[in-house]
UniProtKB/Swiss-Prot annotation:
Keywords: Ribosome biogenesis. It comes from Sulfurisphaera tokodaii (strain DSM 16993 / JCM 10545 / NBRC 100140 / 7). GO terms for biological process: rRNA processing. Residues 6-176 form the Brix domain. Signal peptide: none annotated. This is Probable Brix domain-containing ribosomal biogenesis protein. Probably involved in the biogenesis of the ribosome.
Amino acid sequence: MLIHRIEIVFTSSRDAPLRVRTFLNELTYVFPNSIKINRGRQSLKDIIAKSIYLNSKYLVIIDVIKGNPGRFRVYDLTSKMLKYNFIIYGVTLLTELKLHRTLIKRGCIGKIEDQKIKNMLIDLGYIYIENCDVYANGDYIIKDNNYVFELKFTKDDKILGPVIRFQLYDRNKNIN
């Protein structure tokens, strides 16, 4: 039996509500070679140990703010450092759009205006080639008088993953 290598582990802050768990499920569909670990009451140290045991490169933690996805943190498990830290301004889930999930085998970068988001997508396995299952596209928009970055996962103008709106935020932090 062939088992693919796990590159990315997705998890949430403790005891995440249904909307955040659904968001995590949808992320595992649009990021190739990724899995979701239910955090429950496990410590961050336990989640990091499981991620390292799975030989994954990155751990993505979705923090909860007022019952919704609130922060998108990407840890590099080689250096054990926080690599990306974005505030999530809002998400639109596929279930809210009444669309079905499609498992993505190869993701490509389309038009992305923000360099930090582009670098994060490259680190999380998205590449620059022509023929892909999904393309990550994004641009700055004004939403509720705020300047945010909207990221969409699409192919042929069909949305294949959650729509994520980021307020860009960055800070180095060690996870030890």
